[in-house]
Amino acid sequence: MKALSKLKAEEGIWMTDVPLPALGHNDIMIKIRKAAICGTDVHIYNWDTWSQKTIPVPMVVGHEYVGEVVAVGQEVRGFRIGDRVSGEGHITCGHCRNCRAGRTHLCRNTIGVGVNRQGAFAEYLVIPAFNAFKIPDNIPDALAAIFDPFGNAVHTALSFDLVGEDVLVSGAGPIGIMAAAVCRHVGARHVVITDVNDYRLDLARKMGVTRAVNVSRESLPEVMQALGMSEGFDVGLEMSGAPPAFHTMLDTMNHGGKIAMLGIPPGDMAIDWNQVIFKGLLIKGIYGREMFETWYKMAALIQSGLDLTPIITHQYAIDDFQKGFDVMRSGHSGKVILNWS
């Protein structure tokens, strides 16, 4: 079958032919319809330090997708041929303390689809049936293909009560923008998003944020004053991994504020712990999606009217995959989808 693979330990990604994946007793086989390019895939393309330490070569990459079930293992229940599915990209062990307690998103033995095992940039993907999620009929393929990153956004945004609260989102990448849209949809008062990329700040405005602030030109405290915010943000969602953004978040949080952190800093990050202590801040680390509560929330949010379509800015046929990676690497895109069918 055709697949996009990391064939060499250098910059790039290549179309190749690989064997059809084997189907286990508890697995399903999915014929991929659409797959989206994740920031992780760009890291792998660039062959940065993280990728060099993490990705075995060769590796079929990709983990954001939607497709149709074409085969089921003999022990599988609840799925049948023809079902339209996406899937959780973190395959968990089922045996550690967190897995046995139902907190599978905290499994210490997680294996990543398209990172540690064959991924979704291929004609067919095999995953454990446990990891598959049926897509409701009224959710289109393009939105289903971005459920994985949407899940990061939902998990982060819904970590704390948002109703009537003022929220700061640092980082206007696609996940940050989707998180901001979730905050607005569920009843936050002011949702302010910060970045230095004007293209993505414009995209955030299309998604309905209260203010999109280019912090290289605008003062966040002045924006807060213009909005009538005299005490600071109640909730912070750190999506950038940029130390200056996190420092600004700490500066502008209200006493008793709550921060959810999804962005990954490039290395050790020093912060002013006095702010955390004397403001009584709560900081929560976020990884992946809660299995599978986040997935049900994702579907329900879209079915209740949350419109994510503006975040999908580019779609390409799979043979034009290089164009997709080029636009992702440029920073002038939202989500980029590759069409396999």
Swiss-Prot record:
<feature type="active site" description="Charge relay system">
    <location>
        <position position="43"/>
    </location>
</feature>
<keyword id="KW-0862">Zinc</keyword>
<dbReference type="InterPro" id="IPR011032">
    <property type="entry name" value="GroES-like_sf"/>
</dbReference>
<feature type="binding site">
    <location>
        <position position="200"/>
    </location>
    <ligand>
        <name>NAD(+)</name>
    </ligand>
</feature>
<feature type="active site" description="Charge relay system">
    <location>
        <position position="40"/>
    </location>
</feature>
<feature type="binding site">
    <location>
        <position position="63"/>
    </location>
    <ligand>
        <name>Zn(2+) 1</name>
    </ligand>
</feature>
<dbReference type="InterPro" id="IPR020843">
    <property type="entry name" value="PKS_ER"/>
</dbReference>
<feature type="binding site">
    <location>
        <position position="175"/>
    </location>
    <ligand>
        <name>NAD(+)</name>
    </ligand>
</feature>
<dbReference type="InterPro" id="IPR013154">
    <property type="entry name" value="ADH-like_N"/>
</dbReference>
<keyword id="KW-0479">Metal-binding</keyword>
<feature type="binding site">
    <location>
        <position position="96"/>
    </location>
    <ligand>
        <name>Zn(2+) 2</name>
    </ligand>
</feature>
<dbReference type="Pfam" id="PF00107">
    <property type="entry name" value="ADH_zinc_N"/>
</dbReference>
<dbReference type="InterPro" id="IPR002328">
    <property type="entry name" value="ADH_Zn_CS"/>
</dbReference>
<keyword id="KW-0520">NAD</keyword>
<feature type="binding site">
    <location>
        <position position="99"/>
    </location>
    <ligand>
        <name>Zn(2+) 2</name>
    </ligand>
</feature>
<dbReference type="InterPro" id="IPR004627">
    <property type="entry name" value="L-Threonine_3-DHase"/>
</dbReference>
<dbReference type="GO" id="GO:0008270">
    <property type="term" value="F:zinc ion binding"/>
</dbReference>
<dbReference type="InterPro" id="IPR036291">
    <property type="entry name" value="NAD(P)-bd_dom_sf"/>
</dbReference>
<feature type="binding site">
    <location>
        <position position="93"/>
    </location>
    <ligand>
        <name>Zn(2+) 2</name>
    </ligand>
</feature>
<feature type="site" description="Important for catalytic activity for the proton relay mechanism but does not participate directly in the coordination of zinc atom">
    <location>
        <position position="148"/>
    </location>
</feature>
<comment type="similarity">
    <text>Belongs to the zinc-containing alcohol dehydrogenase family.</text>
</comment>
<comment type="function">
    <text>Catalyzes the NAD(+)-dependent oxidation of L-threonine to 2-amino-3-ketobutyrate.</text>
</comment>
<protein>
    <recommendedName>
        <fullName>L-threonine 3-dehydrogenase</fullName>
        <ecNumber>1.1.1.103</ecNumber>
    </recommendedName>
</protein>
<comment type="subunit">
    <text>Homotetramer.</text>
</comment>
<feature type="binding site">
    <location>
        <position position="107"/>
    </location>
    <ligand>
        <name>Zn(2+) 2</name>
    </ligand>
</feature>
<feature type="binding site">
    <location>
        <position position="195"/>
    </location>
    <ligand>
        <name>NAD(+)</name>
    </ligand>
</feature>
<comment type="pathway">
    <text>Amino-acid degradation; L-threonine degradation via oxydo-reductase pathway; glycine from L-threonine: step 1/2.</text>
</comment>
<feature type="binding site">
    <location>
        <position position="38"/>
    </location>
    <ligand>
        <name>Zn(2+) 1</name>
    </ligand>
</feature>
<keyword id="KW-0560">Oxidoreductase</keyword>
<dbReference type="GO" id="GO:0008743">
    <property type="term" value="F:L-threonine 3-dehydrogenase activity"/>
</dbReference>
<dbReference type="InterPro" id="IPR050129">
    <property type="entry name" value="Zn_alcohol_dh"/>
</dbReference>
<feature type="binding site">
    <location>
        <begin position="286"/>
        <end position="287"/>
    </location>
    <ligand>
        <name>NAD(+)</name>
    </ligand>
</feature>
<dbReference type="GO" id="GO:0019518">
    <property type="term" value="P:L-threonine catabolic process to glycine"/>
</dbReference>
<feature type="binding site">
    <location>
        <begin position="262"/>
        <end position="264"/>
    </location>
    <ligand>
        <name>NAD(+)</name>
    </ligand>
</feature>
<feature type="binding site">
    <location>
        <position position="64"/>
    </location>
    <ligand>
        <name>Zn(2+) 1</name>
    </ligand>
</feature>
<dbReference type="Pfam" id="PF08240">
    <property type="entry name" value="ADH_N"/>
</dbReference>
<keyword id="KW-0963">Cytoplasm</keyword>
<dbReference type="GO" id="GO:0005737">
    <property type="term" value="C:cytoplasm"/>
</dbReference>
<dbReference type="InterPro" id="IPR013149">
    <property type="entry name" value="ADH-like_C"/>
</dbReference>
